[in-house]
Amino acid sequence: IPAGTAVQTDSATANYCVLQSLSGAKVLDRPSPVQLMKAMKTPAEQENFRAAHIKDGVAVCRFICWLQSHVGKEPITECSAAAKLESFRAQQPDYLGPSFDSIMAFGPHGAIVHYEPTAETDVPLEPRSFCLADTGGHYLQGTTDITRTIPLGPLTEEERRAYTVVLKG
């Protein structure tokens, strides 16, 4: 950037390389006006977000109920659980598809950041421990992203304590 050039940037969000490249410029350090405009939602946008989240919430609640009542009674794996959640979403009006690849992680897999079950890593769900579900959907009204830790059966004292601490914040 030529010396003396006026450049607007937000030092709170710009990366180091960008800030270093502005050393000779006249920097106007303030939030991006584009970000500020995008942050303001119209009443129609707010209503659509609400509608999308209600639809998604219905699908996720149905899935959790199904999962907790069927685990241990029929074969369910991480991959088949993700597919079942997708089928519950597909029953909702205006559903367009997943917003990202589902993370459905049983037991120790839940500790792997951005774990994604594959044919090689897929494991059966058992009526114990937790299933971590990080999923989302695209609806005509908006996009969702939801993460839930679902107990699948009796928990160890350590699991119960850790879960409680996380819920308390």
Language-model region placement:
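Active-site neighborhoods and metal-handling regions in enzymes and metal-associated proteins
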Residues: 1-169
